[in-house]
């Protein structure tokens, strides 16, 4: 994944964009064979929910049994770092420009929205995966479910 050099964002902004991208991406099974976002978002949501309690349990378990503190902390940090890796990947993916094949598909979906009478904002810069997620989410809400079959 390559990003534009002008897209220098801080690591915290990348995590925030990843969370926004995860919430925006439509969780439709028909997109799963083409895009890994469904799997990454599912794993990240799972990690956000279950890894912090697992880290606390692991830490208290090893301390209670008289284990060493170093490995206990390392295990807890590893468990808490897993969801951050998912958010990081999603954030980087969100700011990545679309490749030419997806760019064409992006414009086809936008045209379908425009043909259906929906107001579509003009594209001001190179569309990214976040732009694609926004368009797909809107298309799934406002178009019939067969719009993917025509593309």
UniProtKB/Swiss-Prot annotation:
Top-rank taxon of the source lineage equals Bacteria
The alphabetized UniProt keywords are: Cell inner membrane, Cell membrane, Membrane, Transmembrane, Transmembrane helix
Q: Does the keyword Methyltransferase apply?
A: no
| Membrane topology (UniProt) | Multi-pass membrane protein
Q: Which residues cross the membrane?
A: 46-66, 69-89
Cysteines engaged in disulfide bonds, as pairs: none
Coiled-coil spans in chain: none
Q: Which Pfam families match?
A: DUF412
A GO cellular component term found in this entry reads: plasma membrane
Give the record's family classification.
Belongs to the UPF0208 family.
Its protein name is UPF0208 membrane protein YE1335
Q: Which organism is it from?
A: Yersinia enterocolitica serotype O:8 / biotype 1B (strain NCTC 13174 / 8081)
